Amino acid sequence: MLHKRITIIITLLLTVFTLSAQETLNDKMGNQRFRFIGPEGNRAIAIIGEPGNPMVNYIGAASGGLWKTTDGGINWRPIFDDQDISSIGSIDLAKTDPNQVWVGTGETFVIRPAHAMGNGIYFSPDAGRTWEHKGLEKTGRIGRVIVHPTNPKVVYAASLGHTYGPQQERGIYKTTDGGESWKRVLFVDEGTGAADLAIDPSNPNILYAGMWSVNINSWGLNSGGAGGGVYKSTDGGDTWEHLISKGLPGGTDRPVGKTAVAVSQSNPNVVYALFEIDSPELWRSDNKGESWTLMSQDHTWNERAPYYTRIAVGTDNPDEIYSMSVRFVQSLDGGKTRSPRPPRGGGDNHDMWIDPTNPDRMMVA
């Protein structure tokens, strides 16, 4: 009987201490705006978390592989080291099952010939424990992977291609059978690849692609061309429209360089596009891309454009927009004004993920 009482007392004390520790940790975390969660080492260029579960997050490195934490960033472990490639360009999780992980390889944040190439796209059915190579070996660099929100067999891949000459294997690719076969659904020309891709959360047949003409050699970088800019599809990628027809820059009269796109989750009518041009230009549409308004030409939005050019929209506020560049920039009025915000870890801000179930949970790589 005495042993039983002691056991009960110890159990109660451990419960009290555990709850107290959790409350203390939550109090401390609640007072922090951003905290460094690692991992240290290589340049992180892709990031995503499991929606609704702050313990599970993934980070992809430019040439350092794929890393995962299951304790909110306290510990990280490599989960891609047994594969033939270590350059991670993009990550996405299936909305219907977050254990289904897709990874595009190769870096699209490029300013020199030495940037790491990839060898296609990979799929894990078990949260990164095992991997299957799903093709697209010659695409070179996949900067964005998007899994259809309700059908995990449908996946899109935005391929930039290599950067040293003409190539057929670039553009937007689509699979409808979980990667067993792929169809190139958007091809502009042999010198223009896909730098970004966004999907309308209310109508996944609507897609926006940011296309980029770039050539890099040992004596310099040539960014921009008539094929660059924003393209839109309303039929799941079967057909596309170059949105110079809606007033956006691009085409032979006003060629653009690297282009980023983002759609508001809370109001999918709102779409943003950021262009590398003479002065960076941030544009906004309030009607799914039918018409556009120039919001800003502030250089801060897009410094050193080929190396950055990525934007994100707050998940509960269509006027809340972020830009990843030399500085991490936020606007709360749709891009009219901006203010650089922390973190300033090393001057490299490449990617951002905001939890669709919790707008206060956000991560920047």
List the predicted regions and their residue ranges.
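Beta-propeller blade termini and top-face loops
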Residues: 22-365
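Bacterial N-terminal signal peptides that target proteins for export
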Residues: 1-8
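Short, linear, compositionally biased motifs with a strong N-terminal bias
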Residues: 12-13
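N-terminal signal peptide c-region/cleavage motif recognized by signal peptidases
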Residues: 16-18
